[in-house]
Amino acid sequence: MANKALILLAVLFCAQAVLGVTIVSKSEWGGRSATSKTSLASYLSYAVIHHTAGNYCSTKAACITQLKNIQAYHMDSLGWADIGYNFLIGGDGNVYEGRGWNVMGAHATNWNSKSIGISFLGNYNTNTLTSAQITAAKGLLSDAVSRGQIVSGYILYGHRQVGSTECPGTNIWNEIRTWSNWKA
């Protein structure tokens, strides 16, 4: 029995390593609790990619500062229940929990109830994605499929495709258009 448990742990560890996904929980980065939550359905058909259009961060400490600033702006200035995105990806290659799984975001008007929102920290009209960020995003999307959050044939959009905005910035836009689930 101990051997089976050891094998299971090894398989789970390898699966995490293959996806390359490290999710820093909201409690770990010191995020505030949401004032309310609306459940998000499973097996969604869409994922929407954003950029925060703010400062770029390349260390965990700098990314945590940005996350707290964004959450404060979304909650205190805009009056939202929480940070708008389900997940955010820093220049350090970490995935940071925003609203997380199964909670509706506030990231794309008329699309919040049918998509997960993933945002890159920074302004990608000027910043460029690192290979670690690309790996993290693709791993997160694979994880979302594995969890049943989005369907395997999900459609990937840049925010500009579902709203009047430059988001997710030219550099992310050029990158995601090469990904297999992106649709024009």
Curated annotation (Swiss-Prot):
<keyword id="KW-0964">Secreted</keyword>
<protein>
    <recommendedName>
        <fullName>Peptidoglycan-recognition protein SC2</fullName>
        <ecNumber>3.5.1.28</ecNumber>
    </recommendedName>
</protein>
<feature type="binding site">
    <location>
        <position position="159"/>
    </location>
    <ligand>
        <name>Zn(2+)</name>
    </ligand>
</feature>
<keyword id="KW-0391">Immunity</keyword>
<keyword id="KW-0862">Zinc</keyword>
<dbReference type="GO" id="GO:0005576">
    <property type="term" value="C:extracellular region"/>
</dbReference>
<dbReference type="GO" id="GO:0008270">
    <property type="term" value="F:zinc ion binding"/>
</dbReference>
<dbReference type="GO" id="GO:0009253">
    <property type="term" value="P:peptidoglycan catabolic process"/>
</dbReference>
<keyword id="KW-0479">Metal-binding</keyword>
<comment type="similarity">
    <text>Belongs to the N-acetylmuramoyl-L-alanine amidase 2 family.</text>
</comment>
<feature type="signal peptide">
    <location>
        <begin position="1"/>
        <end position="20"/>
    </location>
</feature>
<feature type="binding site">
    <location>
        <position position="50"/>
    </location>
    <ligand>
        <name>Zn(2+)</name>
    </ligand>
</feature>
<feature type="disulfide bond">
    <location>
        <begin position="57"/>
        <end position="63"/>
    </location>
</feature>
<dbReference type="GO" id="GO:0042834">
    <property type="term" value="F:peptidoglycan binding"/>
</dbReference>
<keyword id="KW-0399">Innate immunity</keyword>
<keyword id="KW-0378">Hydrolase</keyword>
<dbReference type="InterPro" id="IPR002502">
    <property type="entry name" value="Amidase_domain"/>
</dbReference>
<keyword id="KW-0732">Signal</keyword>
<keyword id="KW-1015">Disulfide bond</keyword>
<feature type="binding site">
    <location>
        <position position="167"/>
    </location>
    <ligand>
        <name>Zn(2+)</name>
    </ligand>
</feature>
<feature type="site" description="Important for catalytic activity; essential for amidase activity and zinc hydrate coordination">
    <location>
        <position position="85"/>
    </location>
</feature>
<dbReference type="GO" id="GO:0160032">
    <property type="term" value="P:Toll receptor ligand protein activation cascade"/>
</dbReference>
<dbReference type="InterPro" id="IPR036505">
    <property type="entry name" value="Amidase/PGRP_sf"/>
</dbReference>
<dbReference type="GO" id="GO:0045087">
    <property type="term" value="P:innate immune response"/>
</dbReference>
<dbReference type="Pfam" id="PF01510">
    <property type="entry name" value="Amidase_2"/>
</dbReference>
<dbReference type="GO" id="GO:0061060">
    <property type="term" value="P:negative regulation of peptidoglycan recognition protein signaling pathway"/>
</dbReference>
<dbReference type="InterPro" id="IPR017331">
    <property type="entry name" value="Peptidoglycan_recognition"/>
</dbReference>
<comment type="function">
    <text>N-acetylmuramyl-L-alanine amidase involved in innate immunity by degrading bacterial peptidoglycans (PGN). Probably plays a scavenger role by digesting biologically active PGN into biologically inactive fragments. Has no direct bacteriolytic activity.</text>
</comment>
<dbReference type="GO" id="GO:0008745">
    <property type="term" value="F:N-acetylmuramoyl-L-alanine amidase activity"/>
</dbReference>
<feature type="domain" description="N-acetylmuramoyl-L-alanine amidase">
    <location>
        <begin position="45"/>
        <end position="169"/>
    </location>
</feature>
<dbReference type="GO" id="GO:0002814">
    <property type="term" value="P:negative regulation of biosynthetic process of antibacterial peptides active against Gram-negative bacteria"/>
</dbReference>
<dbReference type="InterPro" id="IPR015510">
    <property type="entry name" value="PGRP"/>
</dbReference>
<dbReference type="InterPro" id="IPR006619">
    <property type="entry name" value="PGRP_domain_met/bac"/>
</dbReference>
